[in-house]
Amino acid sequence: MKHIAIAGLGVVGGGVAEILLKNAALLEKNAGEKIVLKAIYTRTPKKDGPFAPYFVSDFSAIEQDPEIDLVVETIGGSTVALDFVSRALKAGKHVVTANKQLIAEHGLELFALAKANGVNILFEASVAGGIPVLNPLTRCLGANEITEVSGILNGTTNYILTQMLENGESYADALSNAQRLGYAEADPTADVEGIDAARKSCILSGLAFGKNVSPEDIHVEGISKVDALDAAFAESGGMKIKLLGRTLLQNGKRFCFVSPHFIKASALLAGVNGVFNAVCVRASEVGEVLFAGPGAGRYPTASAVVGDIIDIVKNPGRVQPAGWDACNEAPASFSQFH
């Protein structure tokens, strides 16, 4: 029996808790061992509801509980989350997180902590939500030399661009509709300026090429300057506009960047519309492989988190090589890319 604690009961954390409770029999079958929810840390515990028996208001209760084997971090950000994840790893507890900012900015530090304490930190849900990408990239494609990983990594921007090209909406109208439908935050800066996609691109680059990439080292350009003229040009040329996060090798140089692209309508990524995400991998033996599906949302993201939990429980004693090495060789300048 493995005991799980969740830190953070927002959209994703609540989804994880629901899945752990309602799918307990299925999870036991797939993991080969019973997985039991033991505690949920939240700053605002409620006295009623299905999660009330699990609430704790002090993370120390989780950190110091010898029965808790694994901590799920769904707080977000890189301040409190970094503190809690570091403490969990030092306490000898495995960690599963969906936090792309945490991994992109502090991955090296956390990988070293996990290794030093003989535990795992897994983060499949940090890129493309419910789409299995990181595990296939590092395991299933392990016989391949990866040459490029390109992706539509942000559903908000993909929805906006789809509305502009398919329905003739202006950027402002498409953004307003995205906010009304809950696809965009009240402050959409991290999405529309490419910051969210950049964090995910850093993770993909680290896993694909084994070298650390910091978000501040890559060229980032969002979609806020895409206008009706761009949409008309794309349509006239039989193309689509997509905000892509790309990491690739070209002429012996490694590039990593985020920017809007004109792509042919026949390209694999061209047919991925609305809030969907997709990642296209180019590899030496299999050629092009496309992973596509819901890249965000309560249950898709929670599904990926629980998948990592099962992976850890199913393989007791195996400490996986997490992430990438400490080589801080910055990617080549975007100006050199052709």
Residue ranges and their predicted role:
Residues A304, I309-H338:
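A conserved regulatory-domain signal marking ACT and ACT-like small-molecule sensing domains
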Residues L175-G271, F276-A278:
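Substrate-binding/catalytic subdomain of NAD(P)-dependent oxidoreductase enzymes
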Residues A7, E73-I75, A98, E105, ...:
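Structural motif
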Residues A81-R87, A91, K100-T138:
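Rossmann-fold NAD(P)-binding glycine/threonine-rich loop
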Residues H94-V96:
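A short hydrophobic/small-residue beta-strand
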Residues V289, G293-Y299:
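Glycine-rich phosphate/pyrophosphate-binding beta-alpha loops
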Residues R139-L204:
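Conserved anion/nucleotide-ligand pocket segment
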Residues M1-A91:
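N-terminal glycine-/serine-/threonine-rich beta1-alpha1-beta2 phosphate-ribose binding loop
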